C-alpha cells in the first residue's frame, strides 16, 4: 500500500497475552505490550480482555485473580479519496 495515500491513525485494541494472529498478518506479536504495525489490507484477529491469575508455585494455589485490560497500539490508515 502506498503510504502517501494514507492518513495515519492510532487505534487502541484490548489484547490478551495469548491471542491468535491471522496467517496474513505482517508479523507475529509475542507480547500484549508490543507495538504492532499491521498492513490495513490484511486481517488481524484480536481477542479481548482476559483474566490473569497468579499461582503460588509451591502449593499451586491461585493467589491473585485480576481482570486486566492489556492494550496494544494498532497503526492503521484511512485512504484519501
Curated annotation (Swiss-Prot):
Pfam families: DUF5492 (PF17596). This is Uncharacterized 9.4 kDa protein in PE38 3'region. It comes from the Viruses. InterPro entries: DUF5492.
Amino acid at each position: 500500500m502506498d503510504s502517501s495515500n494514507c492518513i495515519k491513525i492510532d487505534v487502541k485494541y484490548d489484547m490478551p497475552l495469548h491471542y491468535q494472529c491471522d496467517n496474513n498478518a505482517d508479523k507475529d506479536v509475542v507480547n500484549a505490550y508490543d507495538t504492532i504495525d499491521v498492513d490495513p489490507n490484511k486481517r488481524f484477529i484480536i481477542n479481548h480482555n482476559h483474566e490473569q491469575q497468579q499461582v503460588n508455585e509451591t502449593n499451586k494455589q491461585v493467589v491473585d485473580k485480576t481482570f486486566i485490560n492489556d492494550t496494544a497500539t494498532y497503526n492503521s490508515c484511512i485512504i484519501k479519496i
